[in-house]
């Protein structure tokens, strides 16, 4: 055994020398130099001061501008809400624990932070599933008379929360557990031990199958079919140029969101799966710390992608910030831009069925 397991923790270091201590009671500077903990604290501070404004602005701008309240935009707003849950529910505690060198909030605080981190990540993943299904239905048209409306959007939002809770809540009630990971300054699902007392092995398998593999399979299937359909439609000119351009813009934005999600979360999932499949193997604390903290950047990239790639939302945001005026919008292109970006809205209600 190359680690030390306690009642509520697992530290990736053997206690042969007797230096290993509980991450809830003592600084963990034997795992890494103090300056590395300071770097983690500074990183979390950056995510807080950068992530809160852009996610809050996403919500505020959509509330202020009625034309942004399109059905599928509700899913994008759902991502912003999930990001804010992560920012308020986990980031401050992670920053404070990194500053102190150990998890000062105890096992209860670890459960609290682990729950919100898992909940936010899963809402993000299942939101991308809903977006992928919407793109598939709208562009590929397997159901010719289907129109994505507000009711479908609310159902999609509800699905994301139900599935996220089905993943984040069980460790709080005895199926698996949340423990400090890596340098012991942030908490997540216990991938490190089998822990038969809480049936940890079955939960981790359930999580990887139901809450990671299946969602990604759905996403890849939808976009695989979508790419083929877009190419066929372009070749046959089945849609107007304006409609094709609008659908391409929306699809491109959502695909980039999926790629960004994979960049942020795939390293974490891969390392966690490796650790789980190699119980007791030797690995350093940095091995899990880097992907775990890198995954937290997910709270920042989604709103940035949305702002940068959705011209209608970007114009509304600039108008809100500039107190009702958009100094960057040319007068002669106002009419054309408005019609184009309105068509680019992530709402299938504006796309005529075949």
From Swiss-Prot:
Keyword Glycoprotein listed: yes
The site (Plays an important role in the conformation switch to the active conformation) lies at 113
Which residues does the entry place in the Extracellular compartment?
1-36, 97-110, 174-202, 275-286
Q: Could you tell me which Gene3D superfamilies the record lists for this protein?
A: Rhodopsin 7-helix transmembrane proteins
Q: Does the UniProt entry include the keyword Disulfide bond? A: yes
* Classification lineage: Eukaryota, Metazoa, Chordata, Craniata, Vertebrata
Residues bearing N6-(retinylidene)lysine are 296
Query: Which region ranges are annotated with the description Disordered?
Result: 333-354
Q: Which residues lie on this side of the membrane: Cytoplasmic?
A: 62-73, 134-152, 225-252, 309-354
- Disulfide bond annotation, renumbered to this chain: 110-187
**What are the GO BP annotations of this UniProt entry?**
absorption of visible light; G protein-coupled opsin signaling pathway; visual perception
Q: Show where the record puts the motif 'Ionic lock' involved in activated form stabilization.
A: 134-136
One of the Pfam families matching this protein, by short name = Rhodopsin_N
* Record field: transmembrane: 37-61, 74-96, 111-133, 153-173, 203-224, 253-274, 287-308
Gene that this sequence comes from: rho
What is the topology of this protein in the membrane according to its UniProt annotation? Multi-pass membrane protein
Protein name, UniProt field: Rhodopsin
Give residues with lipid attachment (S-palmitoyl cysteine): 322-323
What the entry says about post-translational processing? Phosphorylated on some or all of the serine and threonine residues present in the C-terminal region. Contains one covalently linked retinal chromophore.
Which keywords label this protein?
A: Cell projection, Chromophore, Disulfide bond, G-protein coupled receptor, Glycoprotein, Lipoprotein, Membrane, Palmitate, Phosphoprotein, Photoreceptor protein, Receptor, Retinal protein, Sensory transduction, Transducer, Transmembrane, Transmembrane helix, Vision
Q: What the protein does?
A: Photoreceptor required for image-forming vision at low light intensity. While most salt water fish species use retinal as chromophore, most freshwater fish use 3-dehydroretinal, or a mixture of retinal and 3-dehydroretinal. Light-induced isomerization of 11-cis to all-trans retinal triggers a conformational change that activates signaling via G-proteins. Subsequent receptor phosphorylation mediates displacement of the bound G-protein alpha subunit by arrestin and terminates signaling.
Family annotation (PROSITE patterns)? G_PROTEIN_RECEP_F1_1, G_PROTEIN_RECEP_F1_2, OPSIN
Glycosylation sites (chain numbering): 2, 15, 200
- One term of GO molecular function: 11-cis retinal binding
List localization entries. Membrane; Cell projection, Cilium, Photoreceptor outer segment
């Amino acid at each position: 055994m190359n680690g030390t397991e306690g009642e509520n923790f697992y530290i990736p270091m053997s206690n042969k020398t007797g230096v290993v201590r509980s991450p809830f009671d003592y600084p963990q500077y034997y795992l890494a130099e103090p300056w590395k903990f300071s770097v983690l604290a500074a990183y979390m501070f950056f995510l807080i001061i950068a992530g809160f404004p852009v996610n809050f602005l996403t919500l505020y701008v959509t509330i202020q501008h009625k034309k942004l309240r399109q059905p599928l935009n509700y899913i994008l707003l759902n991502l912003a809400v999930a990001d804010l849950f992560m920012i308020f529910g986990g980031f401050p505690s992670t920053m404070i624990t990194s500053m102190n060198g150990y998890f000062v909030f105890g096992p209860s605080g670890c459960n609290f932070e682990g729950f919100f981190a898992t909940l936010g990540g899963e809402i993000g993943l299942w939101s991308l599933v809903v977006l992928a299904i919407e793109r598939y239905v709208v562009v590929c048209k397997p159901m010719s008379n289907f129109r994505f409306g507000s009711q479908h959007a609310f159902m999609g939002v509800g699905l994301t929360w139900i599935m996220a809770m089905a993943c984040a809540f069980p460790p709080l009630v005895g199926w698996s557990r949340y423990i400090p990971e890596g340098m012991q300054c942030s908490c997540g699902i216990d991938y490190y031990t089998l822990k038969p007392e809480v049936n940890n092995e079955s939960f981790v398998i359930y999580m990887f199958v139901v809450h990671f593999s299946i969602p990604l399979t759905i996403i890849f299937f939808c976009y695989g079919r979508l790419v083929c359909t877009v190419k066929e439609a372009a070749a046959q000119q089945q849609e107007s140029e304006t409609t094709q351009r609008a659908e391409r813009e929306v699809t491109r934005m959502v695909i980039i969101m999926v790629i960004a999600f994979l960049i942020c979360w795939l390293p974490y999932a891969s390392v966690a799966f490796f650790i789980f499949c190699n119980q007791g193997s030797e690995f350093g604390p940095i091995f899990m710390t880097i992907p775990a903290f890198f995954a937290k950047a997910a709270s920042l990239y989604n709103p940035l992608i949305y702002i940068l790639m959705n011209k209608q939302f970007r114009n509304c945001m600039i108008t809100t910030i500039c107190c009702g005026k958009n100094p960057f919008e040319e007068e002669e292109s106002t009419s054309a831009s408005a019609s184009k970006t309105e068509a680019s809205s992530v709402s299938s209600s504006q796309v005529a069925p075949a």
